[in-house]
Amino acid sequence: MAGLGGHVNKLLILTTGLGLAVSGIGPVAQAQPADTTHISRDPLFTTKDAWIAMGFVAGTIALYPADRYFARKLQTPHNQENQFLQNTATDFRFMGTPGSLYIGVGMYAVGRVARIDRMADLGLHGTEALLLASTTVNLVKGIAGRARPMADIENERSFVLGRGFKKGNDLYRSFPSGHSAMGFAAAAAVTSETSKWWPNSTWFIAPVMYGGATMIAASRMYNNAHWASDVVMGAAIGTFAGTKVVRYHHSHPGNRIDKWLLHPHVEKKPDGTVAVGLAIETH
């Protein structure tokens, strides 16, 4: 319980920090219009996306022959008995799952209650990206049925079609990494969203967010739960989930999800009471 309390405290600190940043630090942030009014003209998928996807696939294939090497190196007594590495891996693992989801939902809830549009916007779109990444990852895990290194560190080639769908078969749901996907989905969503508010901020926000996501991925390798190629493919899925969710919402500002959850209908009645409802349209 003490360990869980420590994780919760860190999440509260991180969420508070993100909230202060998102609510508008400095006059530049305050002078900019609400993010939800920004309409992107970019197509959902571009040629650049194809090149990025090919890069991730190439990286996954390139690392595959080295999976066993990295797994062995990380499981040496020197690394596993290092208290600093143990604590760091535990913290980042929690930040990946369930921490990222807690932060996303928390930011959305606080943003709605406090009427901080940007915080609610980021929380909602970030949470959507996490759910999309998680759904995709779990589908691929079930199909691939790859054995985790903790099942047999000498057999990185153990793939059995559909094995990951069987109940109680978590040891055979290694590819791709869910924690990695969640970390990179959060990083991509935050980077994409904030780049629309503060175009010149990407140079420092992106390294911080993607650096944290990389640490989440590395923690799973350290814990012997994933091979190197697992975390690269998880990073690919998360990155695309985060960027595409944000791009979709900003190119379709009238979509139902944003209308329902970011812009509820508020009506003041003659008796002075206020009614709040969802702005649902029917066609």
Please tell me what each predicted stretch does:
Residues T36-T37, Q80-F84:
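Flexible, solvent-exposed coil segments and beta strand-coil junctions
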Residues A53-I61, G104-M107:
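Short, glycine/alanine-rich hydrophobic alpha-helices that insert into or span membranes
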Residues Q83-I103:
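Interfacial helix-start motif at the membrane-water boundary
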Residues R68-Q80:
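Interfacial/capping segments of alpha-helical transmembrane domains
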Residues G59-A71:
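Alpha-helical transmembrane segments of multi-pass membrane proteins
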Residues I103-D121:
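Long, highly hydrophobic alpha-helical transmembrane signal-anchor segments
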